[in-house]
């Protein structure tokens, strides 16, 4: 049992250190050797845990998204908030996490461009990584409609509406290099109020 725990602990440490390398170097310039050096281990040891840098990158992003989902689920389960407040708080929490991980977002964009050049659809990768987040947004909307707190509309339309704020946030931070999302925060708050009864 201790061996499994140690293996999982080492794997998590590798992922944490790999994120640092990806943020410093970008996806294309990050190498297995640089990740091993950051971890303080030999490259051959790194191969015991991961087969290549793409696998490390995917697991690193997955780990980050799990942390995001934990934050969001804690808001979602807060009984003291109504549906409008929950959705607003979730979007604002996501905005804050995106601002804190601006550099990582640039690496993700770099990775998606790299995939596209390899002939792999970035859209499929993004959809797979964001399906849980979209599900959480949809379920909060459905709950709000059932509770009589939000206007009725098609769930997919509501999901797309809410998710578009996240896409706008990423675009503003990575492509237009905005320093913060203060204007988008105000717009999102206003827009979510329009969903309320």
Language-model regions: role of each:
Residues 96-138:
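Short secondary-structure transition hinges
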Residues 1-9:
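N-terminal intrinsically disordered/low-complexity leader segments
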Residues 59, 73-102, 158-162, 185:
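Hydrophobic alpha-helical connector segments
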């Amino acid at each position: 049992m201790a061996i499994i725990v140690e293996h999982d602990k080492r794997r998590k440490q590798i992922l944490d250190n790999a994120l640092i390398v990806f943020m410093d170097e970008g996806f294309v310039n990050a190498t297995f050797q640089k990740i091993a050096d950051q971890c303080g281990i030999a490259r051959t040891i790194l191969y015991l845990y991961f087969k290549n840098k793409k696998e490390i990158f995917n697991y690193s992003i997955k780990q980050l998204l799990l942390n995001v989902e934990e934050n969001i689920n804690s808001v979602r389960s807060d009984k003291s908030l109504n549906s409008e407040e929950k959705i607003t708080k979730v979007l604002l929490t996501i905005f804050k996490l995106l601002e804190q991980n601006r550099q990582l977002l640039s690496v993700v964009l770099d990775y998606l461009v790299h995939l596209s050049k390899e002939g792999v659809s970035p859209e499929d990768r993004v959809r797979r990584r964001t399906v849980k987040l979209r599900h959480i947004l949809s379920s909060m909307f459905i709950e709000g409609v059932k509770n009589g707190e939000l206007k009725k509309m098609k769930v997919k339309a509501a999901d797309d509406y809410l998710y578009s704020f996240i896409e706008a946030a990423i675009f503003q931070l990575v492509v237009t290099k905005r320093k913060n999302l203060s204007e988008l925060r105000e717009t999102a708050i206003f827009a979510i109020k329009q969903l309320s009864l």
